A protein has these predicted regions:
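Structural alpha-helical scaffold elements that stabilize or flank donor/cofactor-binding regions
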Residues: 35-36, 222
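Aspartyl protease catalytic domain
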Residues: 155-157, 161-217
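Glycine-rich anion-binding loop/nest that anchors nucleotide
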Residues: 47, 232-234, 325
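An anion/phosphate-binding loop that grips the pyrophosphate of nucleotide cofactors and donors
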Residues: 39, 226
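N-terminal carbohydrate-binding/catalytic regions of secreted carbohydrate-active enzymes
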Residues: 32-35, 41-56
Length: 372
């Protein structure tokens, strides 16, 4: 019997992997509802898109149980389109409607971020001790149709950082702080690394001017020192990331593999595939059919039936895992995002098994990536 690769647990860290196409099913819908039901005193929920009935019902139970201890913030619309035309994670605007339908509107705050940027987080903080995060939205698509990974982490220190970030998004000036960092300003610093058992976890956030490009800078630095890279990404279009990948991994001998979403890659590519103004040679990997594969996903539909390859995942040197809400695109730098950089051979092995399942499935039954 093949080993069950859908769930990994080590001490206070639990990882739930999901892909219906690759037959990896950790039942994240149930685990998310159980996480919410486990709240005894307080629950903070920051979510880009919420439509899943089981999750909404669990939040309704939490409202009855916790009263003022429940607070939800959600993305309330993208606002005007950005001049670049580059977007991320399209969605129908139903979250607010459903929150009201389930009687949760008095516990919820709509977040409007100016300039077409997104409140793109997907995390919960429970009782100041536990964090739920990952790549998946709380939707039918995010929990049952897409490729996603979710984490439940017990750590008071990590919970404090996420709670502070949550409160920052409620600040009246939050929506207007998403602008490029002053180049003369001090470089952003990551939050302190926390240990969960033997796993070192460093959280990164993009929540405004003080942390602008914090996550991107850390990811590029990690790639610059890596010799082996595995990427599972909805899209791959950040200039800094693309440049280091071209410089260090475009050689046929380089140890790199990737799983991407063909439809969403068009959002970040230059003509004829897309409308980006980035140099075509940065997308060398879309022609590398041996090392990069595309998921047989479909383009966005207004209903909650989107089946994107939705991970935002990198595994480096069998030691480091990068995952969270942060797409590897330029747009992510000015969204509200969170990502984790974890150092642990055991965690990296679990994520590699998941990656390999996706890669093998899409190598056989995938969809070609767009080329330029």
């Amino acid at each position: 019997m093949a080993p069950n690769i859908s769930i990994f647990q080590a001490g206070g860290l639990r990882v739930y992997f999901y892909s219906h196409r690759a037959n990896v099913n950790s039942n994240p819908t149930k685990h998310l509802a159980d996480f919410i039901d486990g709240a005894k005193k307080a629950l903070l929920c920051a979510i880009y898109d919420i439509q899943d009935q089981s999750t909404l019902q669990a939040l309704k139970r939490a409202a009855t149980r916790l009263s003022t201890g429940l607070h939800i913030i959600y993305d309330a619309g993208k606002g005007p389109a950005r001049k670049t035309g580059v977007t991320a994670d399209p969605k129908p605007s139903k979250s607010g409607q459903l929150i009201k339908q389930y009687g949760l509107d008095s516990y919820a705050t709509a977040v409007h971020v100016q300039g077409g940027n997104l409140m793109h987080d997907k995390f919960l903080v429970r009782d100041a001790v536990d964090v739920w995060t990952g790549s998946g939205n709380f939707t039918k698509g995010g929990l049952t149709l897409q490729d996603n990974n979710f984490l439940a982490i017990t750590s008071a220190a990590l919970s404090q950082v996420y709670a502070d970030t949550f409160r920052g998004m409620l600040h009246p000036a939050h929506g207007s702080t998403h602008s490029p960092k002053n180049p003369k300003g001090a470089p952003p610093k990551p939050h302190a690394t926390v240990k969960v058992g033997a796993v070192k976890i460093t959280p990164y956030f993009t929540t405004g001017v003080n942390e602008f490009e914090d996550a991107e800078t850390a990811i590029v630095k990690a790639l610059q020192g890596a010799k082996k890279v595995r990427i599972a990404a909805m899209n791959l279009g950040d200039p800094g990331i693309l440049q280091v990948l071209k410089q260090r991994f475009s050689s046929p001998q380089a140890d790199i593999r990737g799983v991407l979403d063909p439809g969403q890659m068009r959002q970040v590519m230059p003509p004829p595939a897309g409308r980006s103004k980035q140099p075509a040679d940065l997308f060398w990997f879309t022609k590398d059919h041996n090392r990069f594969v595309g998921a047989p996903s479909h383009t966005f539909v207004p209903s909650d039936n989107n089946d994107f390859m939705h991970n935002k995942l990198m595994i480096l040197d069998d030691q480091i895992v990068i995952t969270g809400s942060y797409n590897f695109s330029e747009h992510a730098e000015v969204n509200d995002e969170n990502t984790l950089i974890m150092q642990s051979p055991a965690v990296a092995k679990a994520y590699t098994q998941y990656f390999d399942a996706l890669f093998e499935q899409y190598k056989k039954n995938g969809k070609p990536l767009p080329i330029v």
